[in-house]
Amino acid sequence: MTNAFFLTGTDTEVGKTVASRAILHAAASANIKMAGYKPVASDSTPTDEGMRNSDALYIQDASVVELDYQEVNPYAFEAAISPHLAAEQEGQVIDFDVLSAGLEHLKSKSEAVLIEGAGGWRVPISHTDFLSSWVKREKLPVILVVGVKLGCLSHAILTAEAIKNDGLELVGWVANRINPGTENYADIIKMLEKNLPGKKMGEIPYMPALKNVTYQSILI
C-alpha cells in the first residue's frame, strides 16, 4: 500500500515547499519512489501551456517519479489570494473528488506521495469547506512545517491541537528558520520538542534561495 503524507504549515510563507523539496530529495537518496503533489495553488502565472505555480514546479522537479504538471497541480489559480477567493474569481469549484482522484493516480505510480497543502491548516477552499476537511476525509498522516519566528510556538501548538481534534496524527514536524535574526532560536526548538507530538524530522537553516535546497540541508 502506498504511503501518503500531507504537509502543512503554521502559516503561509513558512517554508512548506523548502521542506517538501528536502523530503523528496531525501526519498530519492534512499531509493524511495516518491511523488510530490500540490493539489491547490494560488499565485500562478499564465503560460502558453496553462497556469504554472512556482512551488508546484519545484515539487515536480524534485519528485522521484516523472510527472506531468497537471498530475502535480490540478488546481492552479492566478490571484495571490486565498484559494477559495481565487477559485471564485475564476468561476471554479475545488472538488474533493478531483483531489482524491489525483492522489489515487499518483499512488498508482509511486511508493509514497508527499502532498503539500496551501497556506495553513485551516485554509478555506470554499465558503463552507477547508482543505483540512479533505485531509480528514482521506485520513492522511500530517507533517507540520514550523516557520521559526516570534510567535511561532503558539501557532505550532494550536495547529497541532487542531490536527488532533480532526482525528488525525501529526507524525512529524520540521523547523524552518525563516528569519536569521530570530533570538533564542535554540530555546524555541526545545519548546517545540517538548510540546509537539510526532518526530522532529529536521531543522532547515535560513536559506534565501530555494534552488539551493537539497536533502543534505535538512536532518531527516
Swiss-Prot record:
Residues reported in the UniProt entry to bind substrate: S42
Co-factor requirement: Mg(2+)
UniProt-listed SUPFAM superfamilies: P-loop containing nucleoside triphosphate hydrolases
Binding site for ATP: E13, V14, G15, K16, T17, V18, D55, E116, G117, A118, G119, N176, R177, N212
Compartments where located: Cytoplasm
Recorded superkingdom: Bacteria
Known function: Catalyzes a mechanistically unusual reaction, the ATP-dependent insertion of CO2 between the N7 and N8 nitrogen atoms of 7,8-diaminopelargonic acid (DAPA, also called 7,8-diammoniononanoate) to form a ureido ring.
Matches recorded under NCBIfam families: bioD
Similarity field: Belongs to the dethiobiotin synthetase family.
UniProt-recorded name of the protein: ATP-dependent dethiobiotin synthetase BioD
Protein species of origin: Photobacterium profundum (strain SS9)
Lineage, opening ranks: Bacteria, Pseudomonadati, Pseudomonadota, Gammaproteobacteria, Vibrionales
